[in-house]
């Protein structure tokens, strides 16, 4: 039986505080952070326990998806994990596939919504690595409307609302990682796709109160997409809301932007404003999410004609 490769790609995270500077430098395309910038990032990692669980979670996700795919028995799958900013790199994963004799592979980023500035850059790295010697790649651009993914999102929003005293009056905020605002002039689908998935969840649950916002914007001179989550919290407090549910629909695992930006920074601001903030559980390697990702890969296999 021929084995079909799966190139599963994720952002990556430092394994210890000693790796933070190299990680940050890689994100900044070789420009080292200033001492103040580095100290601030280290402080945030220390606040969540010294290291992000993202690497371990991503590895568990990859193993679980491979298990579900191979349980079908029709095709043999092998999942290879490639990170954008840490080891193992995307190019390393492609080289491993080539070494193992993989001729075809589905390439999937663990981010449901497409942007040329995010998912698109992963695919560029993968295609470049596979250009000489393969394997042949079929890249999945987006999967934000995958039915099982939407079901998983909806169940987590519903679960979070049950923790509110007055769930019918709570505001649900669908957030995602902000990107430079210039994507709006590029015809980039990122904003529209985030609205599509959020609206789909709201429709499933019959939500009366929901809105969209951004978080974790980069600290650069150019403008980023807004409004920011902290700004939204201030507006909602002025409007008389007392409970909010934050659904970080653009993320599929616990990491710094969830554990610090929401669980510490946003919750602290909410408390100052007299708001109760409930954050939806992340997908991590929960079976419903794993099955959703497996569905995406199986559909991609059919679409590729493999």
Regions found by a protein language model. Give the residues of each.
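Active-site-proximal alpha-helix that buttresses catalytic centers in soluble enzyme cores
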Residues: 1-306
């Amino acid at each position: 039986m021929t084995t079909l490769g799966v190139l599963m790609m994720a952002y990556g995270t430092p394994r210890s505080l000693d790796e933070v500077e190299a990680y940050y430098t890689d994100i900044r395309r070789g420009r080292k952070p200033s001492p103040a910038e580095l100290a601030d990032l280290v402080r945030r990692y220390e606040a969540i326990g010294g290291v992000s669980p993202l690497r371990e979670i991503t590895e568990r996700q990859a193993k679980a998806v491979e298990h579900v795919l191979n349980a079908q028995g029709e095709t043999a799958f092998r999942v290879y994990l490639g990170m954008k900013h840490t080891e193992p790199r995307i190019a390393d994963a492609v080289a491993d596939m080539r070494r193992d004799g993989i001729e075809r592979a589905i390439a999937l980023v663990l981010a449901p919504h497409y942007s040329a500035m995010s998912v698109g850059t992963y695919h560029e790295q993968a295609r470049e690595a596979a250009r000489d010697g393969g394997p042949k790649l079929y890249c999945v651009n987006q999967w934000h409307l995958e039915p099982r993914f939407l079901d998983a999102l909806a169940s987590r929003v519903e679960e979070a609302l049950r923790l509110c005293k007055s769930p019918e009056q709570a505001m649900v905020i669908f957030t995602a990682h902000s990107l430079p605002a210039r994507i709006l002039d590029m015809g980039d689908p990122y904003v529209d796709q985030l609205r599509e998935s959020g609206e789909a969840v709201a429709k499933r649950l019959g939500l009366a109160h929901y809105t969209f916002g951004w978080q974790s914007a980069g600290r650069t001179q150019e403008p980023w997409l807004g409004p920011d989550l902290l700004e939204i919290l201030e507006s909602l407090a002025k409007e008389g809301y007392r409970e909010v549910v934050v659904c970080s629909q653009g993320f599929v695992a616990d990491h710094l932007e969830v554990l610090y930006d929401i669980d510490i920074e946003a919750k602290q601001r909410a408390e100052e404003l007299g708001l109760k903030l409930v954050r939806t559980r992340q997908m991590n390697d929960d079976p419903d999410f794993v099955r959703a990702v497996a569905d995406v890969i199986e559909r991609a296999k059919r679409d590729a004609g493999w």
